[in-house]
A protein has these predicted regions:
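C-terminal membrane-cytosol helix-exit motif in multi-pass small-molecule transporters
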Residues: 178-196, 213-226, 251-267, 521-529
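Helix-loop-helix hairpins in multi-pass membrane proteins, especially solute transporters
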Residues: 76-214, 223, 232, 240, ...
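Structural signature of transmembrane alpha-helices in multi-pass secondary transporters
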Residues: 21, 28, 57-60, 64, ...
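Small-residue (Gly/Pro/Ala) motifs that create kinks and tight helix-helix packing interfaces
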Residues: 39, 153-165, 307, 339, ...
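Flexible interhelical linker loops that connect adjacent transmembrane helices
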Residues: 8, 185-214, 227-240, 265-283, ...
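Transmembrane core module of solute transporters
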Residues: 14-64, 68, 169, 239-248, ...
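Transmembrane-helix exit segments and adjacent C-terminal regions of multi-pass membrane proteins
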Residues: 1-21, 25, 264-265, 271, ...
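C-terminal module of multi-pass small-molecule transporters
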Residues: 74, 78-93, 97, 101-109, ...
Length: 538
């Protein structure tokens, strides 16, 4: 315990520790947001298709989801600091492999597998190491900064990816990640390890059940856009007339239920569980985890919708799109840093509720501002509000979840917390995308159907084509496709008008569901403590 006091007591050491942990969180969040703007370039470079690169992104998410809870337990087995450093080394090798990848299989090995496994060790360890390096009164600020670093990475990722793709190569992003890993490892020597009790044995059956349950559930969610949530899309797999997505999600939930039953059995036999089911009966912990889920659902939904509007509807480059998203980082960092510092005794429940309302307000303001004639400037105020909400939540939720359990269980909580945020992020992106595409399809067909200038043959053909899925196209992309098809000027103009209206309708619908979800989360804030929590004693 002396090492913990020393690390927390020295301002210089505390800053170095916080820098190392925040840099780790930043690195974990940077990957996907960077690559989303570079998919086509990566596909061309490694000799594959856009679908192949999207599959690599999906695989990275799956690997993290599957190994996050076991990764938290590994930290209890070998030490949280060692797990953090080993995770960084694995992640660094993954980044180097990705930077040098000549083809898709090597990209999958480096990016999807090695980086995914590294992240599953790093993220739970960060949660435990913040708890062990900072006293209770400074923990909320530390968790806020670490969480803010991850959110800022998502916000600046498109800008970094745009700069790299435009002026250098996407490969330099991963070279930069290797350099960051080396820097983190140099700083990590100052980190005080979390206290480790008796070395537990890894529950292999529990690890398998949790990995399969989370993996199958997340895979189902990630396939929803391609296969359909309930009603299967044409040529999509189904069973009993229902999309395979439903069956995969149900199978995942069944496996997670079996996992919890198995863990309860382990406890009854006085054996070390992977996750103690008693933790999930902790009102404060489940409250914090639930709010983490909703935060990441709304947050990632917004990060899906806003770049689409800027890059496709307005035709901005990746560089300009990234620059327009940057204002979010200002209020996010300000709230995450200043709330714990200026209001150390403020009610966490009140801050969380205000943060949720800021998310809701940001989504509603953006929804109201969307218009066919609007410019990129309309996203600034909504993003400032959303950043404020994200920062407010980041300033409280980490401390709320970890302080709900003894410090010896902090890595376990870290694994569960990151699994929950992974689920929220996956569902948020998939839900926003599905609502957007479904609304676009309906709006486009309705507008075309009501237009007398469009021949009935074209209307029928459009219906058949769109039932199999509609892409989110810019006017330039649609006009090019229509010109190649040899359509008349009247039909082209009608289609462009319908596409413009459909895009706005789809974006508004996606934002509406995100705003509704934010409001829904308010009903779960009663589980957040009304006073600043202090760490539970071991």
């Amino acid at each position: 315990m002396a090492t913990r006091t020393e690390a927390a007591g020295s301002p210089t050491k505390a800053r170095i520790v916080l820098l190392a942990l925040a840099a780790g969180q930043f690195l974990m969040a940077l990957d996907s947001s960077v690559m989303n703007v570079s998919i086509a370039t990566v596909a061309e470079d490694v000799g594959t298709t856009v679908t192949g690169v999207q599959g690599a992104i999906t695989a990275y998410t799956l690997v993290m989801a599957m190994f996050m809870i076991p990764g938290g337990k590994v930290g209890a087995l070998i030490g949280r600091k060692r797990a953090f450093m080993i995770g960084c080394i694995i992640y660094g090798f993954g980044s180097l492999t990705t930077a040098l990848a000549p083809n898709l299989p090597v990209l999958l090995l480096g990016w999807s597998f090695l980086e995914g496994v590294g992240a599953a060790l790093i993220l739970p360890a960060i949660v435990a190491l913040v708890a062990s390096n900072f006293p209770a009164e400074r923990r909320a600020a530390a968790y806020g900064l670490v969480a803010a670093a991850g959110a800022v990475a998502i916000a600046v990722g498109p800008l970094v990816g745009g700069v790299a793709t435009t002026y250098f190569s996407w490969r330099w992003v991963f070279v930069g990640e290797v350099v960051m890993v080396l820097g983190i490892l140099l700083l990590a020597g100052r980190i005080a390890d979390a206290p480790v009790g008796e070395r537990p044995r890894i529950d292999l059956v529990g690890a398998l059940l949790s990995a399969l349950g989370l993996g199958v559930f997340v895979y189902g969610v990630l396939r929803s856009d391609e296969w359909g949530w309930f009603q299967p899309k044409p040529d999509a797999p189904s069973w009993l007339g229902v999309s395979l997505v439903v069956w995969l999600m149900l199978a995942g939930l069944l496996l997670i239920w079996l996992f919890l039953r198995w863990e309860a059995r382990m406890v009854r036999r006085r054996r070390e569980p992977l996750v103690d089911p008693a933790m999930l009966r902790n009102r404060q912990l489940t409250g914090g985890l639930t709010m983490f889920f909703f935060q990441y659902l709304v947050q990632m939904g917004v990060f899906f919708v806003v770049p689409l509007y800027l890059s496709v509807a307005l035709g901005l480059s990746a560089l300009k799109t990234g620059a327009r998203i940057l204002p979010l980082s200002v209020t996010l960092l300000a709230a995450a840093v200043l709330i714990p510092r200026l209001l150390p005794d403020v009610s966490p429940r009140r801050v969380v509720r205000l943060g949720v309302l800021a998310l809701f307000a940001g989504a509603v303001v953006l929804m109201a501002a969307l218009d066919a004639d609007a410019g990129a400037e309309i996203v600034t105020l909504p993003l400032l509000l959303i950043g404020l909400g994200m920062g407010a939540l980041a300033s409280q939720l980490g401390a709320v979840t970890v302080s709900a359990v003894p410090e010896a269980q902090s890595a376990e909580v870290g694994g569960v917390q990151n699994a929950v945020t992974n689920l929220g992020a996956s569902i948020g992106t998939a839900l926003a995308g599905s609502i957007l595409i479904a609304t676009m399809t309906t709006s486009f067909l309705t507008t075309v159907e009501e237009n007398p200038d469009v021949p009935s043959k074209v209307k029928t053909q459009a219906t058949v084509e769109l039932e199999s899925g509609v892409p989110f196209l810019s006017d330039a992309q649609l006009k090019s496709a229509l010109d190649e098809a040899g359509t008349s000027k009247k039909v082209t103009e009608a289609a462009l008008d319908a596409n413009e209206k459909a895009r706005i309708d789809g974006l508004r619908a996606a934002l509406a569901i995100l705003a509704f979800t934010a409001l829904l989360s308010l009903f779960f804030t009663t589980r957040i403590p009304d006073t600043q929590p202090s760490s539970a004693k071991p």
